[in-house]
């Protein structure tokens, strides 16, 4: 709806902008509402000391008739010289605030009452608070000259690069930015784009991108945009729900910059910004929070109004929450002028707290009754088979010491009716507290194993009888053995808190980084991973993705990708996934058929990590895992082997059953071997619980050996 040519005609004559009376003009436009011919005539010949005219201020609203506000101030004086227009717009937009009242600032984080709302990370994904500021002694963004913009950049960068501690970081100028840096800032969601048509018409994009840039700290929790819509957008953010911590970091940074450079401020307007909508605090305090039930509650809008907050989808204004983000909303303060920064944050905090209480009430009500959807005929899960209404009622009110409930364990199977298992344990205690359910599922899945028997572990590679099956490489392409493990003293992955996940990452990386010899390598955290590293890990088939809908519903994906990462050795034959489905997936692999060598390397690594950290284990369950299917050894030992004749043999499935192995295509479960991979199968052990790791590997070895004998003998 931009029409710069028509606007230019009126501007060149310094005439009243008739396009504002066009039916296409937004009827809610504030410049349309308050710029009467009389007001225009009284102001049209005035200029600020920096040369800003009335037309400079209204041009964006005349060019873009769909504007909501429609004016931008070119400098501090614009707010007083053109007060008859600006004052009316400001008091309308920020109603019920009156400019005569005066604005007070408060950047003391101690004044906010904000204990962590969601330490278990069940609802709040992330927190972000930003303020807009403009330096004293310069025009606002639309009125800044090129020389002044460069001067602002130099001064601000000087202050930012002097910051220490958790605020210390690096500045990235947009001018001359190389592609690698640009891509990294895009991946981190830190890069800002050239302003839209509204900012273009206001004069904010002049000499783009010169004098613009991005500063962020080493932890990527503190960010400053230079010379975007305002001189400074100062941002503090982090995964999780510690609103107090995020505000505190912001206050320390803002107060330090203000002390050294000074911000434009008046008693009536608060901190000055180019757009009147950002006056006062210039603050937007927000969280991304999952509240699908609260959103549907009849009191939802009343709570928004009561606490002066607003809700939108997490992908920007007017966006909807869909897909994996369904039910996740961006909740932020609505007021900016006439209350302090502390009050803005408190508004948001109190409002989110009230919405979370609604959500918790709705969830508690839902979880108090048996999930009738499990009775649908298409549901074939073990959860459906064993969870009766009577059993549900006997367990529904119990919670582990870490706060895990029965419904936490069954939620994935209730949300995903095509689940085969349907339960995930949130911590070790789930296996005993909810044993009347878990025991049946475990014994069914791992039949004929009985939990009354004792599971024994054996990670001694010398006990495997596994001479190289295919030294010429005619049949076996590759060998891979992995185990799932979880560290003692923590919840299992679905029940981890943010701090626990980060602590596990730190501890495990410490151990992995101390490994020597053929196990020595490097850790690659998923958070902040640059594109070149990401692509390398993709090419090596080492990168893991965010968990699927089953893991999402189980709570495994919380605060993704924070605390997750990949370690691999220099030879690329030893790999560890940290905080994926389990806290550790430890993998040994290599081209060819030396199963004994692959298992030997795995044993050395697993035994060393176990010695330093310790793994969760019980006599009945073996090594613990979030999903009961991975209990016991947590092992999958496999080869990719070309056996077109053996796979066509009438006894193929019988042999697989006899040796407790399973066959599938090499591209994952349910895949079929076709094309150049025709006849190539992934052969792996089927049993995990009730036999040792040595026995799992021996099962796979013996089964593959038998299949190769058939392959070689079949004409």
Curated annotation (Swiss-Prot):
Keywords: ATP-binding, Kinase, Nucleotide-binding, Repeat, Transferase. InterPro entries: ATP-guanido_PTrfase, ATP-guanido_PTrfase_AS, ATP-guanido_PTrfase_cat, ATP-guanido_PTrfase_N, ATP-guanido_PTrfase_N_sf, Gln_synth/guanido_kin_cat_dom. It comes from the Eukaryota. Residues 123-362, 475-714 form the Phosphagen kinase C-terminal domain. Substrate binds at residues 68-72, 229, 275, 317. GO terms for molecular function: arginine kinase activity; ATP binding; creatine kinase activity. GO terms for cellular component: extracellular space. CDD domains: eukaryotic_phosphagen_kinases (cd07931). Gene3D superfamilies: ATP:guanido phosphotransferase, N-terminal domain (1.10.135.10), Glutamine synthetase/guanido kinase, catalytic domain (3.30.590.10). Residues 11-95, 365-447 form the Phosphagen kinase N-terminal domain. GO terms for biological process: phosphocreatine biosynthetic process. Approximate repeats lie at residues 1-366, 367-715. It catalyses: L-arginine + ATP = N(omega)-phospho-L-arginine + ADP + H(+). Its EC number is 2.7.3.3. ATP binds at residues 126-130, 189, 233, 284-288, 312-317. Monomer. Belongs to the ATP:guanido phosphotransferase family. This is Arginine kinase.
